[in-house]
From Swiss-Prot:
One of its GO terms (cellular component) is host cell nucleus. Keywords: Eukaryotic host gene expression shutoff by virus, Eukaryotic host transcription shutoff by virus, Host cytoplasm, Host gene expression shutoff by virus, Host nucleus, Host-virus interaction, Inhibition of host RNA polymerase II by virus, Nucleotide-binding, Nucleotidyltransferase, Phosphoprotein, RNA-directed RNA polymerase, Transferase, Viral RNA replication, Viral transcription. It comes from Influenza A virus (strain A/Swine/Colorado/1/1977 H3N2). Its EC number is 2.7.7.48. Its main location: host cell. Residues 249-256 are annotated as: Promoter-binding site. This is RNA-directed RNA polymerase catalytic subunit. GO terms for molecular function: nucleotide binding; RNA binding; RNA-directed RNA polymerase activity. The lineage of its organism: Viruses, Riboviria, Orthornavirae, Negarnaviricota, Polyploviricotina. RNA-dependent RNA polymerase which is responsible for replication and transcription of virus RNA segments. The transcription of viral mRNAs occurs by a unique mechanism called cap-snatching. 5' methylated caps of cellular mRNAs are cleaved after 10-13 nucleotides by PA. In turn, these short capped RNAs are used as primers by PB1 for transcription of viral mRNAs. During virus replication, PB1 initiates RNA synthesis and copy vRNA into complementary RNA (cRNA) which in turn serves as a template for the production of more vRNAs. It catalyses: RNA(n) + a ribonucleoside 5'-triphosphate = RNA(n+1) + diphosphate. Residues 50-81 are annotated as: Disordered. It comes from the Viruses. InterPro entries: RNA-dir_pol_NSvirus, RNA_pol_PB1_influenza.
């Protein structure tokens, strides 16, 4: 059936069709090659915005540092990072005056978190800069490596498993004259292959000990590794993002915990809530402004955009904010929170992989690592790269660039939101002391500003005052990219408001379709996405029904599981036809086994195996869900699993879907090619780590293992737990005497082995 798309819009107001203009269908652009150029851009731009600041040299690392705080007040509209410290402190004081006790209470909440958080909090997150190997690793591996190095250097506070004790080790490590680390390296040898008699390169992985002096260690500890941000839609140029190492992460986590606690209490903050809760919060602020602007007042809203938010923020500013927020708090607490901004004031940006050169004539390729950029002859580079390198050279140390000003993306989202809200807070009439007043919403660098005044001149004056106040704390509202409208129509964090929020359905488009996990999960995720969009995003019944039919079609093409009686010939159709013919109750077959689709918009919440169970032949049931069938997934059956879905905007969301283990919930194996690379040693470490953690969780279901288990090691804890459990099971008659004594014997053997080691 062909539809003329223009007909769809005849009865729609333009705002409701906004979502069709978004660049969200199709694959997003990915970056290839090195991010070195983008990182140099960031470093150079950040310094340019603060160029009138004071230069100093870090006594420990010798890095040149630029401090723009209390720099000259701006004379034009160019973005600048010259925040005035007294202005920031005053904004904080007024914020506290409007919300009595807010800082005090948040500090108390945070203090509790600080004392309870376990070091395993740092294992969350995919890529983390691993300073021991000088490259990115999964967070769990990077943490394990760091703790291992600390331990071999006599730092043992972290054995107790509290994050705060790990951070004590980090502080101590910075005072050490040198650190000994273990690095992986690979040797290449040319050997003759016995089978083919050809020469092949054989790689072996070795571990070697290396000593790092205080200066080099500090540089590594303060380094943020950089990568290119992938999958950004609607941009022509890519940009660099940073991933900090384990030394910085824990401190940042506590600062963000404090800031999050403050944001939760601020009605203008778009963080940390999301989804419908966020929409409700925003609608409240708009309602307040519109009710107050009765017939006498005009009300306008700016859909705001800030120029280079991160690059104009300054860690020194955040230090001042934290010092103010934690006044009257215990010394240890103030110290632990001030470390993150201090480390960021001294941060180094790693320039990434460097540049790749190739000669067409000689068919040669060579990599110029970032470390060489300081000394290489610039005649090899093109004009723009040459300029970048010349500019960054004074800042380079060991392949990293000193980057004192600026924040790097996504590090202090909550704290910078507090700063933004403190300026919105100054819009109350008691502070503006005139006829105009403002309020608004802030979520990291995105804001919406609502200004009320008796006439247009007042609105203009209010906007100007807001603009200038922002400049004083290093926030640069972009006059080119912000636009103003009568209140009632604006956009904030990709929510479009028109007398209420319009569903921006296109944002969800990328998450429709077949995920490619396995037949069982894909079916479940597919219908859950449709269900969720009916609940949250105005997906109407007719469209949902159509989405469902398209999904089933897509699913059948992906897994080549067309109906059993189809004429389509695929590699699977021969087997599926046989199954179809020998099945009595054909309605009971899974869609992925050539069965019919029984889903409609009323039963999307039911897993397929439950939906069809009563309709299945008995032997089909027996094959699908029999734990003795080697193809049934042997993971414990959890009622829900988490899938990662990619909305078009913002980070990947985790979405729950029902998981029932059947023969279709298989798990694909890891790609073998990694086993031949230098990553292999790391992979083995990671698997060991994974196995130990899984084993530990078997002994201590999550409820009991989150709490500190005293000073005993993991093995001791597991052995004693095994003994207790075995005794209980034996006394209650769940296990026989022979089994009980066997368990006890194994426990003793393990302890014996530990003693010998």
């Amino acid at each position: 059936m062909d539809v003329n798309p223009t007909l769809l819009f005849l009865k729609e107001p333009a705002q409701n069709a906004i979502s069709t203009t978004f660049p969200y269908t199709g694959d997003p652009p990915y970056s290839h090659g090195t991010g070195t150029g983008y990182t140099m851009d960031t470093v150079n731009r950040t310094h340019q915005y603060s160029e009138k600041g004071k230069w100093t040299t870090n006594t420990e690392t010798g890095a040149p540092q630029l401090n723009p705080i209390d720099g000259p007040l701006p004379e034009d509209n160019e973005p600048s990072g010259y925040a005035q410290q007294d202005c920031v402190l005053e904004a904080m004081a007024f914020l506290e005056e409007s919300h009595p006790g807010i800082f005090e209470n948040s500090c108390l909440e945070t203090m509790e978190v600080v004392q309870q958080t376990r070091v395993d909090r740092l294992t969350q997150g995919r890529k983390t800069y691993d300073w021991t190997l000088n490259r990115n690793q999964p967070a769990a591996t990077a943490l394990a490596n760091t703790i291992e190095v600390f331990r071999s250097n006599g730092l043992t506070a972290n054995e107790s498993g509290r994050l705060i004790d790990f951070l004590k080790d980090v502080m101590e490590s910075m005072d050490k004259e040198e650190m000994e680390i273990t690095t992986h390296f690979q040797r290449k040898r040319r050997v003759r292959d016995n089978m083919t008699k050809k020469m092949v390169t054989q790689r072996t992985i070795g571990k070697k000990k290396q000593r790092v002096n205080k200066r080099s260690y500090l540089i590594r500890a303060l380094t943020l590794n950089t990568m290119t941000k992938d999958a950004e839609r609607g941009k022509l140029k890519r940009r660099a993002i940073a991933t900090p190492g384990m030394q910085i992460r824990g401190f940042v986590y506590f600062v963000e915990t404090l800031a999050r606690s403050i944001c939760e209490k601020l009605e203008q903050s778009g963080l940390p809530v999301g989804g419908n809760e966020k929409k409700a919060k925003l609608a409240n602020v708009v309602r307040k402004m519109m009710t107050n602007s009765q017939d006498t007042e005009l009300s306008f809203t700016i859909t705001g955009d800030n120029t280079k938010w991160n690059e104009n923020q300054n860690p020194r500013m955040f230090l001042a904010m934290i010092t103010y927020i934690t006044k009257n708090q215990p010394e240890w607490f103030r110290n632990i929170l001030s470390i993150a901004p201090i480390m960021f004031s001294n941060k180094m940006a790693r320039l990434g992989k460097g540049y790749m050169f190739e000669s067409k004539r000689m068919k040669l390729r060579t990599q110029i690592p970032a470390e060489m950029l300081a000394s290489i002859d610039l005649k090899y580079f093109n004009e723009s790269t040459r300029k970048k390198i010349e500019k960054i050279r004074p800042l380079l140390i060991d392949g990293t660039a000193s980057l004192s000003p600026g924040m790097m993306m996504g590090m202090f989202n909550m704290l910078s939101t507090v700063l933004g809200v403190s300026i919105l807070n100054l819009g109350q009439k008691k502070y503006t002391k005139t006829t105009y007043w403002w309020d608004g919403l802030q979520s990291s660098d995105d804001f919406a500003l609502i200004v009320n005044a008796p006439n247009h001149e007042g609105i203009q004056a209010g906007v100007d005052r807001f603009y200038r106040t922002c400049k004083l704390v290093g926030i640069n509202m972009s006059k080119k990219k912000s636009y103003i409208n009568r209140t009632g129509t604006f956009e904030f964090t990709s929510f479009f408001y028109r007398y209420g929020f319009v569903a921006n359905f296109s944002m969800e488009l990328p998450s429709f379709g077949v995920s490619g996990i396995n037949e069982s999960a894909d079916m479940s995720i597919g219908v859950t996405v449709i269900k969720n969009n009916m609940i949250n995003n105005d997906l109407g019944p007719a469209t949902a029904q159509m989405a469902l039919q398209l999904f089933i079609k897509d699913y059948r093409y992906t897994y080549r599981c067309h109906r059993g009686h189809t004429q389509i010939q695929t590699r699977r159709s021969f087997e599926l036809k046989k199954l179809w013919e020998q099945t009595r109750s054909k309605a009971g077959l899974f869609v992925s086994d050539g069965g019919p689709n029984l889903y409609n918009i009323r039963n999307l919440h039911i897993p397929e195996v439950c939906l069809k169970w009563e309709l299945m032949d008995e032997d089909y049931q027996g094959r699908l869900c029999n734990p003795l069938n080697p193809f049934v997934s042997h993971k414990e059956i959890e009622s829900v699993n988490n899938a990662v879905v990619m909305p078009a905007h913002g980070p990947a969301k985790s979405m729950e879907y029902d998981a029932v283990a059947t023969t279709h919930s298989w798990i694909p194996k890891r790609n073998r090619s990694i086993l031949n690379t230098s990553q292999r040693g790391i992979l083995e470490d990671e698997q060991m780590y994974q196995k130990c953690c899984n084993l530990f969780e078997k002994f201590f279901p999550s409820s009991s293992y989150r709490r500190p288990v005293g000073i005993s090691s993991m093995v001791e804890a597991m052995v004693s737990r095994a003994r207790i459990d075995a005794r209980i099971d034996f006394e209650s008659g769940r296990i026989k005497k022979e089994e009980f004594s066997e368990i006890m014997k194994i426990c003793s053997t393990i302890e014996e082995l530990r003693r010998q080691k």
